[in-house]
């Protein structure tokens, strides 16, 4: 895993994914100075999370997609777009929750907490069920975090029953789609197997 994280990018796609990570690091300073420490912390958490696709050896296209989605999600929060454009929250939850659930699934498989779906009789169904469950769990944790933030950190954070249900439904749908596409997300030499020092770069 560490070798996969530290190796030089191979090709334009991997370089693009690394450029997005560098952009996230710059965003920590920009958000912290321009919108306050909480915004800077949010960007720092996102920047850390953006290392996961590289660490897991996922294909660069997935790495890029994850980076773009989480950066859009966090900057939408920093800029207050969720408050001015209420519907924007739903597609962002769909994409973000789906990709995060898929990454969590891959991590749990790599650490042998979960069985690799390819070893089971119905791999697509198994991956879809588990990833959807993980996505719903992540959605609940996010709603708890929003409630905590609204109650103790910033009352401008929007919370509400309809908002929470909508977020959970759309996030669960995104996780279901990610689970159904798990074979694409993990179609690389290092995604679900333990990375090796001489592993080839992940395909596009």
Question: Which residue ranges define each predicted feature?
Answer:
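Interfacial helix-loop-helix junctions of multi-pass membrane proteins
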Residues: 80-89, 136-176, 180
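Membrane-interfacial alpha-helical segments at the cytosolic side of multi-pass membrane proteins
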Residues: 97-114, 151-157, 172-186
């Amino acid at each position: 895993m560490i070798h996969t994280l530290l190796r030089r990018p191979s090709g334009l796609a991997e370089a693009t994914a690394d450029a997005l990570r560098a952009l996230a690091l710059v965003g920590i300073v920009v958000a912290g100075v321009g919108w306050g420490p909480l915004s800077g912390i949010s960007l720092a958490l996102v920047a850390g999370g953006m290392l996961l696709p590289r660490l897991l050896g996922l294909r660069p296209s997935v790495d890029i997609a994850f980076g773009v989605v989480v950066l859009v999600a966090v900057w939408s929060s920093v800029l207050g777009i969720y408050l001015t454009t209420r519907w924007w929250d739903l597609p962002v939850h769909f994409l973000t929750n789906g990709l995060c659930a898929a990454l969590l699934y891959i991590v749990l498989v790599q650490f042998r907490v979960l069985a690799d779906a390819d070893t089971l009789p119905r791999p697509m169904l198994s991956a879809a069920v588990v990833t959807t469950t993980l996505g719903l769990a992540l959605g609940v944790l996010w709603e708890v975090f929003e409630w905590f933030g609204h109650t103790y950190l910033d009352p401008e954070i929007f919370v509400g029953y309809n908002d929470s249900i909508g977020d959970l439904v759309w996030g669960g749908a995104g996780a279901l789609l990610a689970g159904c596409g798990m074979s694409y997300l993990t179609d690389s030499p290092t995604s679900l197997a333990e990375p090796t020092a001489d592993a080839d770069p992940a395909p596009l």
